[in-house]
Amino acid sequence: MRLRAGASSDVGRLRERNEDSFVVKDPLFAVADGLGGHLGGEVASRLAVDTLTSEAGADGPEDGLADRLRAAVHQANSAVAERAANDTRLTGMGTTLTALVAGRDRIYLAHVGDSRAYLLRDGDLRLLTEDHTLVHKMLLEGEINEQEAETHPHRSILTRALGVDGNVQVDEGVVEMILLVEHLRDPQVRLGRVERGQPAALGGEAQAISVGA
């Protein structure tokens, strides 16, 4: 499978420091959005991406890619938690992480937080991940509607993030790329951080990685 990839990140208009990190290193692609403010968020996202790259960035057997990716995310979680525990300036830091490893015919996903992975197919953009936020949980439980979720004051509160819990729960998925190739001239998988509280689309404020086959 031939891959084309690109990445960009912008601090935006509201923050002074860019707390996002990414990796575009075939077969590994990932985005991370740091939490904790000041130095912490930037350190957490960079550490998570660096650990992920070290543990899952090399080519390996197809049948072991999902296991390697899962283990790498858990290793990244431990690395962020350990750094925060050993440096009082970084107390409370954490990060989201949405990553994929490309195999021969499949793409393996791992996800924690509210960064997002999308599948772009025949012009349709489909969300592949679920936001781990308090507001999304409230939405699923019927406590609020989608319009209320977009402006809810707690829409930035995460229910899962790397570095916060020693045994983080990782969402996983598989995209069968061979099926996409049969139907598409230019199939793409996109990973991005969409502004929190904007559940509908990958817009201009998103940091994104797109992978085409």
What are the functions of these language-model segments?
Residues 205-212:
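Short, intrinsically disordered C-terminal tails of secreted or membrane-associated proteins
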Residues 1-193, 200-204:
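PP2C/PPM-type serine/threonine phosphatase catalytic domain
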